[in-house]
């Protein structure tokens, strides 16, 4: 994970063979920073790492990794993945990042690769999403939004950036 070309060069000196372009940067900031690496174009992004296991606290420890869901006051559901080995949770955003439909802007940034992060998707949904991205990014054609996303996704900081 490299915020600028100087950090990227330092990471490479220490043996990193692939870097990730920060999802916090917007399109202009990515272009201006000179950061090279792979770019996340799909995935539920981590919002928080909790220092305690929600599963263990609420239902008792099962000793195996699993997905639970938190619901907020607006009925948004946030996936929670427990990491049993170290007894903590990763809480993900309720909507996945999706840069489907923005392939011209993304490829214009010349990332070394694009990456889809699958975390909580069912296999069939992951297949639909992968097919749509392959169609658009792999063959440079405009792809239809897979039904599984149903307009429930975010563009993240790609159009906004961090303030």
Residue ranges and their predicted role:
Residues 1-163:
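Active-site pocket-lining/capping segments in soluble small-molecule metabolic enzymes
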């Amino acid at each position: 994970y490299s915020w600028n070309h100087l950090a990227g060069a330092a990471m490479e000196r220490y043996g990193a063979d692939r870097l990730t372009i920060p999802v916090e940067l917007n399109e202009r900031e990515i272009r201006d920073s000179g950061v090279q690496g792979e770019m996340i174009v799909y995935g539920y992004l981590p919002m928080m790492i909790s220092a305690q296991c929600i599963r263990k606290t609420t239902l008792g420890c099962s000793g195996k990794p699993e997905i639970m869901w938190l619901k907020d006051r607006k009925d948004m559901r946030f996936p929670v993945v427990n990491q049993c080995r170290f007894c903590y949770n990763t809480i993900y955003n309720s909507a996945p990042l999706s840069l489907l439909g923005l392939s011209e802007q993304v490829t214009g940034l010349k990332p070394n690769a694009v990456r889809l992060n699958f975390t909580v998707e069912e296999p069939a949904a992951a297949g639909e999403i992968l097919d749509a991205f392959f169609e658009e990014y792999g063959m440079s054609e405009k792809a239809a939004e897979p039904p599984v996303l149903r307009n429930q996704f975010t563009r993240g900081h790609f159009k906004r950036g961090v303030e």
